[in-house]
Structure formats: C-alpha cells, structure tokens
Amino acid sequence: MTDSASHSPAQAAPSGCPLSWPQQRQNLILFAVCTGTQYLAAPVLYVGITQASLCNRLGADARTSNLPGTLFFAMTAMPALIAWLSPGVSSLRRNLSLCYATSALMLTVLAVTLALPVSNQIKVAMIILQGGISGAVMPAAIALLWEVIGRGSDESRRGLALSMAFGAGPLLAVLGSFCQTALLGGDLFGLHFAGLAYPTSFIILFAAAVPIMGLAALFSQFFVVAPVEKEAEREPLSAVGGLIAGLPLMFASVALMHCSSVPLEAADALPGSAVSRTMMQMLGGLCAGGAALSFVHHFRSILRQRVLLLATIVTILVYAGNVIPSNMNLYSEQVLGNVPLKYAGVQNMLRFGFKVVAGTVLGWFLTRTNPRAGILATSSIFLAAQIWAILVTGPWYLVAFGLHGAGELVGVYAPNYIVSASHRNELRRNLAFVTMLMVPAAPAGYLYGSIVDFVSESGWQVMGMNSKTLGFRLSFCACAVFILCGIILAIVKLPAKPRPGLDSKELI
C-alpha cells in the first residue's frame, strides 16, 4: 500500500467502497474489537458446557441441562427474521448495538437471579432463557458485523482485520476460559485453583461478561456505513412463513417431550397421568413433523438442487455433533471423579486452544485439496472426539474437548462447500440458508440428554458400567452415528469439486 493510496478516497475504494481509507480503517479495527469481545466472553456466550455444569449444580437432570444448548442452536434462525423485520442499511448500527445490549441485559438478569433467594427451578429457567437469547442475538450480531464490514471496507484491505479477529480472537477465548477456571476452581496443567464458593463464582462469571458486551454495544455505534440511494423494502410475510411456523412448532415439540418425561413418581400423582403423558408425546411428535415440513417449505428453492440437498443433509448430520458438549461436560463426574463445574474452564480452554492450531493447519490443507476434503477432515476430527470420549478415562479424557473444538471448524468448511456449489447470483440467499442449518440439528442435544436419563432411570448396567456411565457413552455413540452417516454420505454422494453450472441443474 502506498502513502498516496492511504489518503485518496478514490484509490482507497478500487472495488466500489465509497468510504475513505481512515473510515475503512476505523471499521476494520472496530470489527476486530467487537469480534474479540465475543471471544473474551466465550465461556458464557458459547452456550453449552458452562450452562450445563450450572444446571447440574442446581439439581437438573441431563435432559434439562441440555436445554440451554438446544435452545441456543434452535434460535440461530433469528438472523434471517431480524433481516426480514429490519432490512434497511440505515438500521445496521442500531441493530448491531441492540444485539449486544440485549445480551448484556440477559446476562445481568441471570447474574441477579443467581444471587437472589429464589427456587432452583427459577434459576434453571433463567439459564435456559439465557441460552435462547444468546442463540438469537449473537449469531445475528455476527451476521450484522459481516454486513457492516462488507459495506464499510474494501475487500483487499480486510485481511489484517480478519487475522486479528480470528487469529487473536480464539486466544482471548483461551484467556476467558483460564479466568473461568480460576473462578470456578479446578486443576489446570498441574496448577490447582480453589475457586470461589458457589453461587459467588457463577455470579461473577456471568456478571463479568456484562461490561464486555456493553463495550461491544458502545463500539458498534462508531461504525461508518455509507448510505444507499434506496433502502430495501420488507419482503412479504410469505418469504419467512416457513420459519415463523417452524420455530414455535419445534419449541413446542421439545417442551411437550420434556413435560412427558417427568419422573414417574411425580407423574403418578397427577390424574390421568398415563393418558396425559401419551398425549403429550403424540402432540410433540406431530409438532416435530410440522416443524420439519415448515423448514423444508422455507428452503424448497435450494433443496430442489441435488448437490445442495445432499450437502445440506451432510451438514445437518455432522452439525448434530455441535450439541454434545453439554453431555461431555456432565460426564466429567463419572470419568474424572469431580463435579462438572470444576472442569468447565479447562474444557473450554482446550476447546479453543485446539481450534487455534487446527484452524491454521486446515486452512493450509484446504488450499491443497478440494471443498469436500474440508468437510471430511473436520467431520473426522468431530468423530474422533466422540470415540475418544467413549474409550478414554481419567485426565486424558479432557483431550476429547480439544478434538471437539477442532472439529467444530466444520461450521466453516461445510458452508464453504455449499458456497462452492452455488451460482454467484445465489450466494447471498444460500449463505443466509447456511446460517440456519443448526436449527434442524438442535433437537439432537435434547435427544442426548434423554438417552442419559432413560438409561439411568431404567438402571441398565453393562460390562461393569453403572447406568449413568452407560447412558453417557450411549449418547456419545448416538452422536458418532450421526456424524459417521454424514461422512459416508459425503464420500459416496458429494462431488469433490462441485460445479455450480452443472451440478445445480440436476433437480430432483
């Protein structure tokens, strides 16, 4: 970059960005800072491990402890709804700031609730709500950040911001996880942390993220977004009708299934309990079917294309691995001999630490292979994490969280395949579609928790394993089966290098 280029608006925007270089630089720095705040608060914003350990501490069963993570991923359809409700470019900064502010408010409410002398049921409900709110606003914030940086900077100048955001960012997540370990207590590579007493430790953990999100909300106001000649108008309701119908049906399905699974001793005290439990299970199944049909209707234009349909099925199957960390954390008591909350920090640290290394290696790997290889590599690591969790006990069990963190990069390489299989004029629509593929995979988290509770309540024991250990290992097996099916389908059916001009014409 020459000095004259850095001071010339005309030269600063060779691809059409109307902003001057100082304005673009400001946007790039703010992008990196806002992304960094999300990583620093990752122990509470990446819903799963921390929330599951807290629910467990409050006496919740495995089904309930999995609900925060399930709801988090179920709400990842919200970016599409927010984009529909407020499509104007002029509202980008406001919407981004509101997302961060909403997260800060929810974290404040949760911290206060944990400090109040209220029942554990209310506290668990607030934890689940925090999972849902985080699932709604944080993916929306990420989508808005990308749109702001897309409109507010030249493509050739984004490299430094991206390296700062996604190179240093995960290191901030490691730092946040270290602080989590110091607060909750536990052992970290030979160092012992006594931690603070409960509930003070969790109150401080959630409260500490409030000012971090507050800063992100404040920084969002300083983005520079060039005005457009004509603002986009809101599309008709029919454009998002499938989502609007599918989301509440999915929530109703999980709620009905959860209510139908109350302990037998509690259910027997209710009149007509057997009938009501059966009825709730039937209604839950109908709601699940209705949700599936609604989502298929919403995505019908994409799912008519053979390669995109197959890639979607592969992605959903593999994404079922994203909702297993709650069970992996809860299993800590069985395999490590201490309560799950004592391992939440080190588990998150390994998760993000492995991700830093894997991100670098896999990026190099992709440049020398093909889009399908990226899916297969990350999916295989995902599968290895479950096999490790099934077979390994003692301190080495924790490596499963590192492998899982590296495997989570399938969330980068599966979308990359779908982008590679898409026509240029369909990219924006298909990228919006990709962000919502966690929605149909989200109920798998509740399934994993249900497996644990069912086996435990049934008292099954095999090969010297108690029912709790057996239940967790079976849930890991179920997760591994989903991932393995995705891998096999990718190998057999997906072309290594999809051809948008040819493959997308193979309509089914």
Model-derived features: where do they sit?
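Helix-loop boundary and gating motifs at the non-cytosolic
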Residues: 9-78, 83-86, 256-266, 307-348
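Juxtamembrane intracellular "pre-TM" segments in multi-pass secondary transporters
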Residues: 10-25, 226-313, 507-508
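Substrate-agnostic recognition of the 12-TM MFS/MFS-like secondary transporter fold
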Residues: 30-44, 48, 68-83, 99-103, ...
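A membrane-interface helix-boundary motif in multi-pass transporters
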Residues: 92-94, 182-211, 266-278, 452-483
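Structural signature of the two symmetry-related core transmembrane helices
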Residues: 94-110, 373-388
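Multi-pass alpha-helical transporter architecture, strongest
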Residues: 111-115, 211-224, 388-389, 475-508
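Helix-loop junctions at membrane interfaces in 12-TM secondary transporters
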Residues: 112-130, 388-400
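C-terminal transmembrane helical hairpin of 12-TM major facilitator-type secondary transporters
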Residues: 373-411
